[in-house]
Amino acid sequence: MVVDKNASGLRMKVDGKWLYLSEELVKKHPGGAVIEQYRNSDATHIFHAFHEGSSQAYKQLDLLKKHGEHDEFLEKQLEKRLDKVDINVSAYDVSVAQEKKMVESFEKLRQKLHDDGLMKANETYFLFKAISTLSIMAFAFYLQYLGWYITSACLLALAWQQFGWLTHEFCHQQPTKNRPLNDTISLFFGNFLQGFSRDWWKDKHNTHHAATNVIDHDGDIDLAPLFAFIPGDLCKYKASFEKAILKIVPYQHLYFTAMLPMLRFSWTGQSVQWVFKENQMEYKVYQRNAFWEQATIVGHWAWVFYQLFLLPTWPLRVAYFIISQMGGGLLIAHVVTFNHNSVDKYPANSRILNNFAALQILTTRNMTPSPFIDWLWGGLNYQIEHHLFPTMPRCNLNACMKYVKEWCKENNLPYLVDDYFDGYAMNLQQLKNMAEHIQAKAA
Protein backbone atom coordinates (compact mmCIF):
# COMPACT_ATOMS: atom_id res chain seq x y z
CA MET A 1 0.00 0.00 0.00
CA VAL A 2 1.33 3.43 -0.92
CA VAL A 3 0.42 5.99 1.73
CA ASP A 4 -0.48 9.51 0.69
CA LYS A 5 1.55 11.58 3.17
CA ASN A 6 -0.67 14.58 2.48
CA ALA A 7 -3.83 12.70 3.44
CA SER A 8 -5.59 13.53 6.67
CA GLY A 9 -4.95 11.02 9.41
CA LEU A 10 -2.03 10.17 11.62
CA ARG A 11 1.42 8.62 11.26
CA MET A 12 3.22 6.96 14.15
CA LYS A 13 5.96 4.41 14.61
CA VAL A 14 5.33 1.13 16.47
CA ASP A 15 7.77 -1.79 16.70
CA GLY A 16 10.04 -0.27 14.04
CA LYS A 17 7.33 0.35 11.43
CA TRP A 18 5.65 3.61 10.47
CA LEU A 19 1.90 3.11 10.52
CA TYR A 20 -0.79 5.20 8.86
CA LEU A 21 -4.12 5.61 10.66
CA SER A 22 -6.93 7.19 8.67
CA GLU A 23 -8.89 10.05 10.21
CA GLU A 24 -11.88 7.72 10.57
CA LEU A 25 -9.79 5.16 12.46
CA VAL A 26 -8.35 7.85 14.73
CA LYS A 27 -11.85 9.05 15.64
CA LYS A 28 -12.80 5.47 16.55
CA HIS A 29 -9.85 5.08 18.93
CA PRO A 30 -11.29 3.64 22.20
CA GLY A 31 -8.87 5.79 24.22
CA GLY A 32 -9.99 9.02 22.58
CA ALA A 33 -7.69 11.96 21.91
CA VAL A 34 -4.59 10.58 23.66
CA ILE A 35 -3.53 8.95 20.38
CA GLU A 36 -2.80 12.42 18.95
CA GLN A 37 0.11 12.90 21.37
CA TYR A 38 2.32 10.58 19.30
CA ARG A 39 1.67 12.01 15.85
CA ASN A 40 4.91 11.60 13.82
CA SER A 41 6.63 10.02 16.85
CA ASP A 42 7.71 6.59 18.07
CA ALA A 43 4.76 5.18 20.03
CA THR A 44 6.16 1.68 20.56
CA HIS A 45 6.39 1.59 24.34
CA ILE A 46 3.41 3.80 25.06
CA PHE A 47 1.35 1.40 22.93
CA HIS A 48 2.52 -1.64 24.88
CA ALA A 49 2.16 0.18 28.22
CA PHE A 50 -1.46 1.17 27.59
CA HIS A 51 -2.73 -1.91 25.75
CA GLU A 52 -1.44 -4.66 28.01
CA GLY A 53 -3.88 -7.60 27.79
CA SER A 54 -6.04 -6.08 25.02
CA SER A 55 -6.35 -8.66 22.24
CA GLN A 56 -8.44 -6.18 20.23
CA ALA A 57 -5.65 -3.58 20.26
CA TYR A 58 -2.98 -6.07 19.19
CA LYS A 59 -5.22 -7.45 16.45
CA GLN A 60 -5.64 -3.91 15.09
CA LEU A 61 -1.88 -3.33 15.35
CA ASP A 62 -1.15 -6.49 13.34
CA LEU A 63 -3.50 -5.29 10.59
CA LEU A 64 -1.80 -1.89 10.45
CA LYS A 65 1.67 -3.46 10.46
CA LYS A 66 0.88 -5.35 7.23
CA HIS A 67 0.94 -1.98 5.49
CA GLY A 68 3.67 -0.47 7.65
CA GLU A 69 6.82 0.84 6.02
CA HIS A 70 10.14 2.54 6.69
CA ASP A 71 9.89 6.32 6.32
CA GLU A 72 13.31 7.91 5.90
CA PHE A 73 11.93 11.46 6.03
CA LEU A 74 10.15 10.96 9.37
CA GLU A 75 13.13 9.05 10.78
CA LYS A 76 15.38 12.02 10.05
CA GLN A 77 12.85 14.42 11.54
CA LEU A 78 12.91 12.41 14.78
CA GLU A 79 16.69 12.69 14.99
CA LYS A 80 16.81 16.45 14.21
CA ARG A 81 14.69 17.65 17.11
CA LEU A 82 16.69 19.83 19.51
CA ASP A 83 15.56 21.15 22.89
CA LYS A 84 16.00 24.70 24.19
CA VAL A 85 16.72 25.12 27.90
CA ASP A 86 14.66 27.68 29.80
CA ILE A 87 13.37 28.34 33.34
CA ASN A 88 12.04 24.99 34.64
CA VAL A 89 12.62 23.50 31.16
CA SER A 90 15.36 20.92 30.56
CA ALA A 91 16.97 19.61 27.38
CA TYR A 92 16.86 15.95 26.41
CA ASP A 93 20.49 15.28 25.52
CA VAL A 94 20.57 11.50 25.02
CA SER A 95 22.23 10.65 21.69
CA VAL A 96 20.31 8.68 19.06
CA ALA A 97 22.68 5.72 19.53
CA GLN A 98 22.19 5.76 23.32
CA GLU A 99 18.46 6.11 22.83
CA LYS A 100 18.25 3.01 20.65
CA LYS A 101 20.20 0.98 23.21
CA MET A 102 17.93 2.27 25.98
CA VAL A 103 14.76 1.42 24.06
CA GLU A 104 15.98 -2.13 23.40
CA SER A 105 17.03 -2.53 27.03
CA PHE A 106 13.65 -1.34 28.29
CA GLU A 107 11.86 -3.87 26.11
CA LYS A 108 13.90 -6.61 27.82
CA LEU A 109 12.94 -5.20 31.23
CA ARG A 110 9.26 -5.20 30.26
CA GLN A 111 9.49 -8.82 29.18
CA LYS A 112 11.30 -9.82 32.39
CA LEU A 113 8.54 -8.29 34.52
CA HIS A 114 6.03 -10.29 32.50
CA ASP A 115 8.01 -13.48 33.02
CA ASP A 116 8.27 -12.81 36.76
CA GLY A 117 4.49 -12.37 37.05
CA LEU A 118 4.45 -8.71 38.09
CA MET A 119 1.99 -7.75 35.33
CA LYS A 120 -0.51 -10.42 36.33
CA ALA A 121 -3.93 -9.18 37.52
CA ASN A 122 -4.77 -9.75 41.21
CA GLU A 123 -8.57 -9.80 41.52
CA THR A 124 -8.48 -10.81 45.20
CA TYR A 125 -6.39 -7.78 46.17
CA PHE A 126 -8.71 -5.36 44.40
CA LEU A 127 -11.81 -7.03 45.83
CA PHE A 128 -10.36 -6.38 49.29
CA LYS A 129 -9.57 -2.76 48.35
CA ALA A 130 -13.10 -2.25 47.04
CA ILE A 131 -14.73 -3.70 50.17
CA SER A 132 -12.45 -1.76 52.54
CA THR A 133 -13.07 1.54 50.73
CA LEU A 134 -16.83 0.97 50.60
CA SER A 135 -16.62 0.28 54.34
CA ILE A 136 -14.99 3.67 54.97
CA MET A 137 -17.85 5.39 53.15
CA ALA A 138 -20.49 3.28 54.92
CA PHE A 139 -18.93 4.11 58.31
CA ALA A 140 -19.01 7.82 57.42
CA PHE A 141 -22.76 7.52 56.78
CA TYR A 142 -23.22 5.60 60.04
CA LEU A 143 -21.40 8.30 62.01
CA GLN A 144 -23.70 10.88 60.45
CA TYR A 145 -26.68 8.80 61.63
CA LEU A 146 -25.20 8.78 65.16
CA GLY A 147 -24.77 12.56 65.10
CA TRP A 148 -20.97 12.61 64.78
CA TYR A 149 -21.27 15.04 61.90
CA ILE A 150 -17.77 16.54 61.65
CA THR A 151 -16.06 13.16 62.07
CA SER A 152 -18.40 11.79 59.40
CA ALA A 153 -17.43 14.60 57.00
CA CYS A 154 -13.71 13.90 57.54
CA LEU A 155 -14.22 10.19 56.93
CA LEU A 156 -16.21 10.87 53.75
CA ALA A 157 -13.29 13.01 52.51
CA LEU A 158 -10.98 10.04 53.09
CA ALA A 159 -13.40 7.69 51.29
CA TRP A 160 -13.48 10.01 48.27
CA GLN A 161 -9.68 10.07 48.16
CA GLN A 162 -9.46 6.28 48.34
CA PHE A 163 -12.14 5.88 45.66
CA GLY A 164 -10.01 8.20 43.54
CA TRP A 165 -7.11 5.74 43.69
CA LEU A 166 -9.36 2.73 43.13
CA THR A 167 -11.08 4.31 40.12
CA HIS A 168 -7.65 5.27 38.76
CA GLU A 169 -6.64 1.61 38.88
CA PHE A 170 -9.80 0.36 37.17
CA CYS A 171 -9.34 3.01 34.46
CA HIS A 172 -5.80 1.68 33.93
CA GLN A 173 -7.21 -1.87 33.58
CA GLN A 174 -5.20 -3.15 36.56
CA PRO A 175 -7.74 -5.24 38.54
CA THR A 176 -8.86 -7.68 35.81
CA LYS A 177 -8.13 -8.46 32.17
CA ASN A 178 -11.83 -7.88 31.41
CA ARG A 179 -11.77 -4.31 30.10
CA PRO A 180 -15.56 -3.79 29.83
CA LEU A 181 -15.90 -4.93 33.47
CA ASN A 182 -13.14 -2.56 34.60
CA ASP A 183 -14.79 0.31 32.73
CA THR A 184 -18.21 -0.42 34.25
CA ILE A 185 -16.85 -0.58 37.80
CA SER A 186 -14.89 2.64 37.28
CA LEU A 187 -18.14 4.31 36.21
CA PHE A 188 -19.73 3.31 39.53
CA PHE A 189 -16.76 4.13 41.77
CA GLY A 190 -15.65 7.21 39.81
CA ASN A 191 -18.80 8.92 38.59
CA PHE A 192 -21.47 7.81 41.04
CA LEU A 193 -19.54 7.54 44.31
CA GLN A 194 -16.65 9.96 43.70
CA GLY A 195 -18.16 12.55 41.35
CA PHE A 196 -15.28 12.50 38.84
CA SER A 197 -16.22 11.63 35.26
CA ARG A 198 -14.48 8.45 34.13
CA ASP A 199 -14.16 9.60 30.51
CA TRP A 200 -12.99 13.09 31.52
CA TRP A 201 -10.41 11.47 33.78
CA LYS A 202 -9.21 9.05 31.10
CA ASP A 203 -8.84 11.81 28.52
CA LYS A 204 -6.91 14.04 30.93
CA HIS A 205 -4.90 11.34 32.65
CA ASN A 206 -3.95 9.15 29.69
CA THR A 207 -2.66 12.24 27.89
CA HIS A 208 -0.61 13.04 30.98
CA HIS A 209 0.85 9.51 30.93
CA ALA A 210 1.58 9.66 27.21
CA ALA A 211 3.48 12.96 27.34
CA THR A 212 4.38 13.58 30.98
CA ASN A 213 5.63 17.14 31.61
CA VAL A 214 5.87 17.83 27.87
CA ILE A 215 4.82 21.41 27.15
CA ASP A 216 1.63 21.84 25.09
CA HIS A 217 0.89 18.11 25.49
CA ASP A 218 0.43 17.47 29.21
CA GLY A 219 -2.57 19.40 30.53
CA ASP A 220 -1.51 18.71 34.12
CA ILE A 221 1.26 21.33 33.82
CA ASP A 222 -1.02 23.91 32.20
CA LEU A 223 -2.45 25.61 35.28
CA ALA A 224 -2.70 29.15 33.91
CA PRO A 225 -4.01 31.61 34.87
CA LEU A 226 -3.60 30.71 38.57
CA PHE A 227 -0.08 29.32 38.18
CA ALA A 228 2.73 29.63 35.65
CA PHE A 229 5.37 26.87 35.53
CA ILE A 230 7.29 27.97 32.43
CA PRO A 231 7.94 31.26 30.58
CA GLY A 232 5.65 30.13 27.75
CA ASP A 233 2.70 30.22 30.14
CA LEU A 234 2.92 34.01 30.27
CA CYS A 235 1.62 34.22 26.68
CA LYS A 236 -1.70 32.78 27.86
CA TYR A 237 -2.73 35.83 29.90
CA LYS A 238 -4.85 37.63 27.29
CA ALA A 239 -8.33 38.28 28.74
CA SER A 240 -8.80 41.16 31.19
CA PHE A 241 -9.42 38.88 34.18
CA GLU A 242 -6.33 36.82 33.27
CA LYS A 243 -4.18 39.95 33.17
CA ALA A 244 -5.57 40.88 36.59
CA ILE A 245 -4.62 37.44 37.96
CA LEU A 246 -1.12 37.84 36.49
CA LYS A 247 -0.50 40.53 39.10
CA ILE A 248 -0.63 37.92 41.89
CA VAL A 249 1.28 35.17 40.06
CA PRO A 250 4.64 36.55 41.39
CA TYR A 251 3.40 35.24 44.75
CA GLN A 252 2.26 31.85 43.44
CA HIS A 253 4.73 29.92 45.59
CA LEU A 254 3.14 31.54 48.65
CA TYR A 255 -0.52 30.80 47.85
CA PHE A 256 -0.07 27.41 46.12
CA THR A 257 -0.54 25.40 49.33
CA ALA A 258 -3.76 27.24 50.20
CA MET A 259 -5.20 26.22 46.83
CA LEU A 260 -4.75 22.46 47.32
CA PRO A 261 -8.12 21.88 49.07
CA MET A 262 -9.88 23.47 46.07
CA LEU A 263 -8.88 20.62 43.76
CA ARG A 264 -12.06 18.61 44.30
CA PHE A 265 -14.23 21.61 43.37
CA SER A 266 -12.18 22.00 40.18
CA TRP A 267 -12.34 18.35 39.16
CA THR A 268 -16.03 17.82 39.94
CA GLY A 269 -16.81 21.04 38.06
CA GLN A 270 -14.80 19.94 35.03
CA SER A 271 -16.52 16.55 35.18
CA VAL A 272 -20.00 18.11 35.03
CA GLN A 273 -18.96 20.28 32.08
CA TRP A 274 -17.44 17.28 30.29
CA VAL A 275 -20.36 14.84 30.57
CA PHE A 276 -22.93 17.29 29.25
CA LYS A 277 -20.76 18.00 26.19
CA GLU A 278 -19.95 14.35 25.56
CA ASN A 279 -22.76 13.82 23.02
CA GLN A 280 -21.16 16.38 20.71
CA MET A 281 -17.54 15.19 20.98
CA GLU A 282 -15.77 13.97 17.83
CA TYR A 283 -14.56 10.66 19.27
CA LYS A 284 -17.10 7.83 18.97
CA VAL A 285 -16.28 6.34 22.37
CA TYR A 286 -17.43 9.51 24.14
CA GLN A 287 -20.66 9.71 22.15
CA ARG A 288 -21.46 6.09 23.08
CA ASN A 289 -20.75 6.64 26.77
CA ALA A 290 -22.54 9.99 27.14
CA PHE A 291 -25.85 8.77 28.63
CA TRP A 292 -24.32 6.67 31.41
CA GLU A 293 -21.70 9.31 32.12
CA GLN A 294 -24.43 11.90 32.59
CA ALA A 295 -26.75 9.62 34.59
CA THR A 296 -24.06 8.61 37.08
CA ILE A 297 -22.81 12.16 37.64
CA VAL A 298 -26.39 13.34 38.25
CA GLY A 299 -26.80 10.36 40.59
CA HIS A 300 -23.70 11.40 42.51
CA TRP A 301 -24.94 14.90 43.22
CA ALA A 302 -28.43 13.57 44.02
CA TRP A 303 -27.14 11.43 46.89
CA VAL A 304 -24.69 14.12 48.07
CA PHE A 305 -27.45 16.73 48.39
CA TYR A 306 -29.89 14.22 49.90
CA GLN A 307 -27.26 13.38 52.52
CA LEU A 308 -26.90 17.08 53.32
CA PHE A 309 -30.70 17.43 53.50
CA LEU A 310 -30.73 14.80 56.28
CA LEU A 311 -28.58 17.02 58.51
CA PRO A 312 -30.54 18.98 61.14
CA THR A 313 -29.45 22.60 60.48
CA TRP A 314 -28.18 24.79 57.65
CA PRO A 315 -24.91 25.70 59.41
CA LEU A 316 -24.18 21.97 59.78
CA ARG A 317 -25.01 21.35 56.12
CA VAL A 318 -22.62 24.07 55.01
CA ALA A 319 -19.87 22.89 57.39
CA TYR A 320 -20.30 19.24 56.36
CA PHE A 321 -20.16 20.13 52.66
CA ILE A 322 -17.05 22.31 53.00
CA ILE A 323 -15.15 19.85 55.22
CA SER A 324 -15.92 16.80 53.09
CA GLN A 325 -15.28 18.51 49.74
CA MET A 326 -12.16 20.45 50.73
CA GLY A 327 -10.82 17.59 52.83
CA GLY A 328 -11.19 15.25 49.86
CA GLY A 329 -9.48 17.85 47.67
CA LEU A 330 -6.52 18.22 50.01
CA LEU A 331 -6.06 14.46 50.39
CA ILE A 332 -5.86 14.01 46.62
CA ALA A 333 -3.99 17.23 45.81
CA HIS A 334 -1.07 16.70 48.19
CA VAL A 335 -0.35 13.48 46.26
CA VAL A 336 -0.94 14.46 42.64
CA THR A 337 1.08 17.70 42.89
CA PHE A 338 4.16 15.96 44.33
CA ASN A 339 5.39 13.59 41.63
CA HIS A 340 5.73 15.78 38.52
CA ASN A 341 5.37 19.45 39.45
CA SER A 342 8.69 19.27 41.30
CA VAL A 343 10.57 18.09 38.18
CA ASP A 344 11.59 20.03 35.05
CA LYS A 345 9.46 20.12 31.91
CA TYR A 346 10.46 19.40 28.28
CA PRO A 347 9.73 21.31 25.03
CA ALA A 348 6.73 20.38 22.89
CA ASN A 349 8.83 18.99 20.03
CA SER A 350 11.38 17.22 22.24
CA ARG A 351 12.90 13.96 21.02
CA ILE A 352 12.20 12.60 24.52
CA LEU A 353 8.80 11.48 23.19
CA ASN A 354 10.65 8.75 21.26
CA ASN A 355 12.13 7.34 24.47
CA PHE A 356 9.18 6.36 26.63
CA ALA A 357 11.23 5.04 29.56
CA ALA A 358 13.50 8.10 29.76
CA LEU A 359 10.47 10.40 29.48
CA GLN A 360 8.79 8.82 32.50
CA ILE A 361 11.96 8.60 34.61
CA LEU A 362 13.22 12.13 33.91
CA THR A 363 9.84 13.74 34.63
CA THR A 364 8.81 11.81 37.75
CA ARG A 365 9.72 11.83 41.44
CA ASN A 366 8.82 9.02 43.84
CA MET A 367 7.81 9.55 47.45
CA THR A 368 9.72 7.54 50.07
CA PRO A 369 7.62 4.39 50.64
CA SER A 370 6.24 2.96 53.87
CA PRO A 371 3.20 0.72 54.58
CA PHE A 372 1.14 3.75 55.66
CA ILE A 373 2.15 5.88 52.66
CA ASP A 374 1.53 2.93 50.31
CA TRP A 375 -2.08 2.88 51.59
CA LEU A 376 -2.71 6.63 51.91
CA TRP A 377 -1.20 7.43 48.50
CA GLY A 378 -2.82 4.49 46.72
CA GLY A 379 0.57 3.27 45.49
CA LEU A 380 1.25 6.57 43.71
CA ASN A 381 4.36 7.02 45.82
CA TYR A 382 5.75 4.48 43.30
CA GLN A 383 4.97 6.94 40.52
CA ILE A 384 7.99 6.04 38.39
CA GLU A 385 7.05 2.36 38.32
CA HIS A 386 3.40 3.20 37.71
CA HIS A 387 4.23 5.48 34.78
CA LEU A 388 6.49 2.89 33.20
CA PHE A 389 3.94 0.10 33.66
CA PRO A 390 0.47 1.66 34.11
CA THR A 391 -1.38 -1.67 33.94
CA MET A 392 0.76 -3.21 36.70
CA PRO A 393 -1.39 -3.86 39.82
CA ARG A 394 -0.68 -1.55 42.75
CA CYS A 395 0.31 -4.47 44.98
CA ASN A 396 3.28 -5.29 42.70
CA LEU A 397 4.80 -1.80 42.44
CA ASN A 398 7.01 -2.19 45.50
CA ALA A 399 8.53 -5.39 44.09
CA CYS A 400 9.01 -3.66 40.72
CA MET A 401 11.05 -0.87 42.32
CA LYS A 402 14.30 -2.86 42.56
CA TYR A 403 14.12 -3.80 38.85
CA VAL A 404 13.61 -0.16 37.83
CA LYS A 405 16.39 1.14 40.08
CA GLU A 406 18.81 -1.35 38.55
CA TRP A 407 17.69 -0.46 35.03
CA CYS A 408 18.21 3.25 35.72
CA LYS A 409 21.70 2.55 37.03
CA GLU A 410 22.59 0.51 33.93
CA ASN A 411 21.34 3.29 31.63
CA ASN A 412 22.81 6.27 33.54
CA LEU A 413 19.41 7.73 34.39
CA PRO A 414 18.55 9.30 37.77
CA TYR A 415 16.03 7.58 40.02
CA LEU A 416 14.36 10.43 41.93
CA VAL A 417 12.91 9.58 45.34
CA ASP A 418 12.46 11.97 48.28
CA ASP A 419 10.48 12.35 51.46
CA TYR A 420 7.38 14.52 51.27
CA PHE A 421 8.75 17.79 52.59
CA ASP A 422 11.88 17.73 50.40
CA GLY A 423 9.83 16.94 47.30
CA TYR A 424 7.23 19.55 48.15
CA ALA A 425 9.96 22.16 48.66
CA MET A 426 11.20 21.41 45.12
CA ASN A 427 7.65 21.89 43.87
CA LEU A 428 7.49 25.32 45.51
CA GLN A 429 10.95 26.13 44.13
CA GLN A 430 9.70 25.58 40.57
CA LEU A 431 6.88 28.04 41.24
CA LYS A 432 9.30 30.49 42.86
CA ASN A 433 11.63 30.32 39.84
CA MET A 434 8.82 31.62 37.65
CA ALA A 435 7.65 34.13 40.26
CA GLU A 436 11.14 35.67 40.32
CA HIS A 437 11.24 35.69 36.51
CA ILE A 438 7.94 37.63 36.37
CA GLN A 439 9.17 40.08 39.00
CA ALA A 440 12.41 40.62 37.06
CA LYS A 441 10.50 41.30 33.83
CA ALA A 442 8.28 43.82 35.60
CA ALA A 443 11.22 45.68 37.17
Curated annotation (Swiss-Prot):
Give me the reactions it catalyses: (9Z,12Z)-octadecadienoyl-CoA + 2 Fe(II)-[cytochrome b5] + O2 + 2 H(+) = (6Z,9Z,12Z)-octadecatrienoyl-CoA + 2 Fe(III)-[cytochrome b5] + 2 H2O; (9Z,12Z,15Z)-octadecatrienoyl-CoA + 2 Fe(II)-[cytochrome b5] + O2 + 2 H(+) = (6Z,9Z,12Z,15Z)-octadecatetraenoyl-CoA + 2 Fe(III)-[cytochrome b5] + 2 H2O
Which SUPFAM superfamilies does the record match to this protein?
Answer: Cytochrome b5-like heme/steroid binding domain
Main localization, broad class: membrane
EC numbers: 1.14.19.3
Q: Does the keyword Lipid metabolism apply?
A: yes
Keyword tags: Fatty acid biosynthesis, Fatty acid metabolism, Lipid biosynthesis, Lipid metabolism, Membrane, Oxidoreductase, Transmembrane, Transmembrane helix
| Keyword Lipid metabolism annotated | yes
Q: Which GO terms describe its cellular component?
A: membrane; presynapse
Q: What processes does the entry annotate via GO biological process terms?
A: acetylcholine secretion, neurotransmission; collagen and cuticulin-based cuticle development; defecation; egg-laying behavior; endocytic recycling; lipid metabolic process; locomotion; multicellular organism growth
* Residues passing through the membrane, by range: 136-156, 296-316, 318-338
What did gene disruption experiments reveal? The fat-3 mutants lack detectable Delta6-unsaturated fatty acids and have decreased C20 fatty acids levels, these animals require an additional day of development before commencing egg laying. Impaired synaptic vesicle (SV) recycling characterized by the presence of enlarged SV and the formation of abnormal endocytic membrane-bound structures at synapses. The number of SVs is reduced by 37 percent although SV production in neuron cell body and their transport to release sites are normal.
Chain ranges of the Cytochrome b5 heme-binding domain: 1-71
Membrane topology reported for the UniProt record: Multi-pass membrane protein
> Which Pfam families does the UniProt entry name for this protein?
FA_desaturase
| UniProt subcellular location | Membrane
User: What does the record give as its pathway?
Assistant: Lipid metabolism; polyunsaturated fatty acid biosynthesis
The UniProt GO MF terms for this protein read: acyl-CoA 6-desaturase activity; oxidoreductase activity, acting on paired donors, with oxidation of a pair of donors resulting in the reduction of molecular oxygen to two molecules of water; stearoyl-CoA 9-desaturase activity
Question: Additional info?
Answer: HPO-19 and T05H4.4 are cytochrome b5 reductases required for PUFA desaturation in Caenorhabditis elegans. HPO-19 and T05H4.4 knockdown or mutation alter FAT-3 desaturase activity.
The record describes the protein's role as: Can function as a Delta(6) fatty acid desaturase. Introduces a double bond in the fatty acid chain 6 carbons away from carboxy terminal to biosynthesize polyunsaturated fatty acids (PUFAs) endogenously (PUFAs are essential for membrane structure and many cellular and physiological processes).
User: Which protein family is named in the record?
Assistant: Belongs to the fatty acid desaturase type 1 family.
User: Which PANTHER family does the record cross-reference, listed alphabetically?
Assistant: DELTA(6)-FATTY-ACID DESATURASE FAT-3, FATTY ACID DESATURASE 2
> What name appears for this protein in its UniProt entry?
Delta(6)-fatty-acid desaturase fat-3
Protein species of origin: Caenorhabditis elegans
